[in-house]
Structure formats: C-alpha cells, structure tokens
Amino acid sequence: MKLTKLLFCFCFLAPLLGHAQQAFKAGVSFGITTSQISGDGLGGWDKFGITGGAFVSAPLSSKNGFRIGLNYADKGSRTKRDTLNFNTFSYRLRYIEVPVQYSFQNGPFTFHTGLYYGRMIKQDILSNSLTYEVNPAFRNYDFGMVLGSTLQMGEHFFIEGRFSTSVIPTRPSPNFANPNSYYEKGNYNQVLYFLIGRNF
C-alpha cells in the first residue's frame, strides 16, 4: 500500500465515521516521541523524534466513540554516547500511521485503545554523524496496538499521552536463538507519544 492509498483511505473513512452520528469532531495534534526497538540489543528509550497529524472522531453515545487519524511519527532506537570512544549509533525510522481507536470519556479524560497501520517512508542508520543503509532492512509496514489518554484543557485544547507497540515483527531478528520466544522472533517498535492538540 502506497502513501496515496493511505491518504485515500483516510479521506474515505472520515465521512463514514461522521455519518455514524450527525455530530463529529476533528482535530490536530503535535508533539514528541521517545522510542526503542525491542530485540535490537541497544535498550533504553533514548531515541527522540517528532510526531503530528490530524484525526476525526465519531460519537456512538455520550461517552463512547471511535477515532481515526493520520499521523507522522519518528521511531527507532539509539545508544547513548560511549564514554570511552565517544561512538554513537541509532536506527532512524520514519512512518505515516493510520490509528483506529475506540474511545471512552470520563469527565475531562478520554481513554483510547485500538490498532494502527504504519507505512515506512524512510529508514537509515546514523553513526558518528554519518548515515548508512539498514541491513537487514526493516519491513516497509508496521502493524500494532496503541493505547492512551487525553486530558481536555478547556473547550478546544488538550494534552495527550500514548503508547504503541508492534504486534508483527518489523524485521526478522538478526540473532534468533530461541524459537519459543515471541520477542526473539524479530524487532518490534515501541513508542511513547507526548502531544498537545486542538479540537475544531
């Protein structure tokens, strides 16, 4: 699926969600990510990036609804600078994502859970200020689960925290030793999102 197909799906599904009930909401959000790749041997939430996008939400009742979005997200992993030789190393993965989530509102808080599909738009390695190709390369898609919560700050503005994890390996593990271990079967993106946004 190409990026144009993702955009088409978003534009096609948004009116359908809105048709579920006459009233629907749209919004935008921007923020930062911190991420790691499970199974890459680097460890730690040391890779920082940016994220942002738009969404539409359709209420099913006064407290329940669905939300679909279209987001850009930086993912990957990074080692801290070595204190002896000062080497650095990071995987830099860039995705366009379409999360589809169920939402439940309780006062100023709204809780979200669902699935996402991500399409890779670029990947590389940054080591000691030089870029290299990733080998073996990551798959050009990412499918996983996402959950989070939103705190409404007045009528229009909100802050949001979100966690996502791949459920299908983003690439086979380079060091697959235990066939009975789920996490040794491959690498999995894990991302924390910290966002501010506005409803329209």
Where are these regions (language model features)?
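Residues on the lipid-exposed face of transmembrane beta-strands in outer-membrane beta-barrel proteins
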Residues: 28-32, 50-58, 70-72, 98-104, ...
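Repeated loop/turn-to-beta-strand initiation elements of outer-membrane beta-barrel proteins
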Residues: 63-66, 108-111, 155-159
